[in-house]
Amino acid sequence: MAEEQQANGAAAENQQQQVQFAIQRIYAKDISFETPSSPAIFRKEWKPDLKLDLNVKHEKIEDGVYEVVLTLTATNKVEDDVAFLCEVHQAGIFTIGEEVQDGQLAHMLGSFCPNILFPYARECVSNLVNRATFPQLNLAPVNFDAIFQRHMQQQAEQAQGQQTADA
């Protein structure tokens, strides 16, 4: 009996330590696809030069509710001509418990949520490229944790540089 109460107490403690997190909605906020060099681009030998840009923004909607927007821009050039320009704003509304501390919240908004959104954005880009009859584009996974850590390190260095300049 005492063991059962101890197990129940441990389970309750684990539930209290878990962060409340829920996905309310994932949606395409904005989609753009351009082929400025068509139809001439289709006659050129396909030697693409792909450039990818990622951006993450977040906004507090209400207490504990955040919109995170992952912007994925793919620009593909053949020689000096833009074959296509694809931009997808993949968004999500997430509930994050009030018990989350600032550093943990920044990590969830800057890394965890974009990791959830990226497969949707990647699929959208792939479908748009396919519909435009270009060769298939399969984007590699992105390590948002590493990007977030690098961003935090750059901010810390800038803050330290600012303090040194002010001294």
Swiss-Prot record:
UniProt entry keywords in alphabetical sequence: Chaperone, Cytoplasm, Protein transport, Translocation, Transport
UniProt xrefs under NCBIfam families: PRK05751.1-4, secB
CC per GO annotation: cytoplasm
Predominant location: cytoplasm
Subcellular localization: Cytoplasm
UniProt family annotation: Belongs to the SecB family.
GO biological process assignments: protein folding; protein tetramerization; protein transport
Organism encoding this protein: Idiomarina loihiensis (strain ATCC BAA-735 / DSM 15497 / L2-TR)
Function: One of the proteins required for the normal export of preproteins out of the cell cytoplasm. It is a molecular chaperone that binds to a subset of precursor proteins, maintaining them in a translocation-competent state. It also specifically binds to its receptor SecA.
Source organism, top-level taxon: Bacteria
Subunit note: Homotetramer, a dimer of dimers. One homotetramer interacts with 1 SecA dimer.
Annotated disulfide bonds: none
Listed GO MF terms: unfolded protein binding
Name of the protein this chain belongs to: Protein-export protein SecB
